[in-house]
From Swiss-Prot:
One of its GO terms (molecular function) is ATP binding. Belongs to the cyclic 2,3-diphosphoglycerate synthetase family. This is Cyclic 2,3-diphosphoglycerate synthetase. It is found in: Cytoplasm. It catalyses: (2R)-2,3-bisphosphoglycerate + ATP + H(+) = cyclic (2R)-2,3-bisphosphoglycerate + ADP + phosphate. It comes from the Archaea. The gene is cpgS. GO terms for biological process: gluconeogenesis.
Length: 432
């Protein structure tokens, strides 16, 4: 069955004609506009199907879809009643409800969302470089207090077949990771990073392409989930890639928003879809934005999903080795993050004597490394070229490699660790 979106800028006879040509229409949603209609009751009588309306057209559309056996929403409206922004809001709601949204020259079709056999949590993002893997590692090691999690990742450099890393059992040394890189694998993939930083079992999967709503074009996550369900672990964490995430209806969703992202990407496009999914929302790098932008992000979230638990956080580097008394070369993906990271590491007893923010730019990174002098160790995030360039460079020169985790720390007075534990307990309790 179909629901149609209509407005008062079309004559009722024209709307009735279009509904008849479409066929299989169960109801209509009135979006606004009064130029060519009388009362809504008269419009309903004219078009011959039940008419839903509300001051908020999204509320009316949601009721229409939930109260009827709707598979498709067909847009028979137009400007000025509907703007491009409105249409993306409608598309986001349709993705959330699992129905197709079709207009004269566009179609948005949701992927069928599968269910995991075991309790599960999705960690998704609003884009790349928002700190999703760092947060995923934090979530995984936090949930070890109440569960035995396994993390299933998807990435553009992931393996063709799911790759199991038993992070609970093996130690991921720089030498081991370099050996993996020399075998032609992406040793800084998310499943290696999660296993290294959190000592949990991980499963790495490949994906290619990402749609506007966040679904991958190709991936092998189904095989990864099947492997995860065969293990003795009792909680599956599905980690997205960039703005793309596995097509699973998990028991809970954690959304990562980068504080430096444009707010247009949150209130527009498919930002509302991701926000509406979330039980817990973590804004990272909040210390790099002003209070006005934090307030704007809060307002957007509260308008779309007021029930979500919202946290504003900053990243603090957590060295996975002893740095006290050592002269460090510091290598990160973000140039802007270097000053605070340097200050934090020096507060732990190190002396940072050289830095590079070009971890994701191999040619510039190699130039930076050649300028490093007088260091005992190199501290590097496990991302991008951390293994095949930085680790290789350091080990060839007898320089110690210390990998860095980025740990989210609240700057809003809330307790993210407590919220993650509560969410994990709720998810486990639902399947008990």
């Amino acid at each position: 069955m179909r629901v149609v979106l209509i407005d008062g800028e079309h004559y009722p006879d024209v709307t009735k004609w279009a509904i008849h040509k479409l066929g299989d229409v169960c109801c209509a949603v009135f979006l606004g506009g009064t130029e060519k209609i009388g009362s809504l009751k008269a419009l309903e009588d004219k078009i011959g199907v039940p008419l839903y309306h509300s001051p908020n057209y999204l509320d009316a559309l949601k009721r229409a879809v939930l109260e009827n056996d709707v598979e498709e929403v067909v847009d028979l409206s137009d400007e000025p009643v509907l703007t491009y922004e409105d249409r993306f809001r409608i598309a986001s709601l349709c993705m959330l409800l699992g129905v197709t949204y079709r207009g004269a020259d566009f179609t948005f079709t949701p992927k069928p969302l599968k269910k995991t056999k075991k309790p599960s949590i999705s960690i998704i993002g609003t884009g790349k470089r928002v700190g999703k893997t760092a947060v995923s590692g934090f979530v995984a090691r936090t949930l070890k207090e109440v569960a035995r999690p396994v993390v299933v990742t998807m990435g553009r450099g992931g393996p063709e077949e799911p790759e199991l890393i038993e992070g609970e059992k093996i130690e991921l040394t720089p030498q081991f990771l370099l050996k993996v890189a020399k075998e032609g694998k992406h040793a800084a993939s998310d499943h290696f990073e999660d296993a290294l930083t959190s000592r949990v079992t991980t499963i790495g999967c490949r994906r290619c392409g990402g749609g506007m709503a966040g679904f991958p074009f190709f991936d092998v996550v189904d095989k990864g989930v099947e492997l995860a369900e065969s293990l003795p672990h009792d909680l599956i964490i599905l980690e997205g890639s960039g703005a793309t995430f596995p097509a699973y209806r998990t028991d809970a969703y954690i959304l990562i928003i980068g504080g430096r992202q444009k707010t247009d990407f949150l209130r527009g496009y498919f930002g509302p879809f991701r926000i509406a999914l979330a039980d817990l929302i973590i804004v990272t790098m909040s210390d790099e934005i002003n209070p006005e932008k934090r307030a704007e992000i809060r307002k957007i979230v509260e308008e779309i999903n007021p029930k979500a638990d919202l946290h504003f956080t900053a990243f603090r580097p957590r060295p996975l080795g002893n740095i006290s008394g050592k002269k460090l070369g510091l290598v990160m993906t973000s140039q802007s993050a270097l000053p605070k990271a340097k200050e934090h590491l020096e507060g732990l007893g190190a002396e940072v004597v050289a830095t590079s923010g070009n971890l994701s730019n191999r040619p510039k990174l190699r130039e930076d490394l050649e300028k490093f002098r007088g260091i005992d160790a190199v501290a590097v995030e496990l991302k991008a070229a951390a293994v095949d360039v930085v680790t290789k460079w350091a080990l060839e020169r007898g320089i110690e490699v210390i990998y860095l985790d980025n740990e989210p720390v609240n700057i809003d007075g809330k307790d993210l660790r407590k919220s993650v534990l509560e969410l994990g307990k709720r998810v486990l309790g639902r399947r008990a």
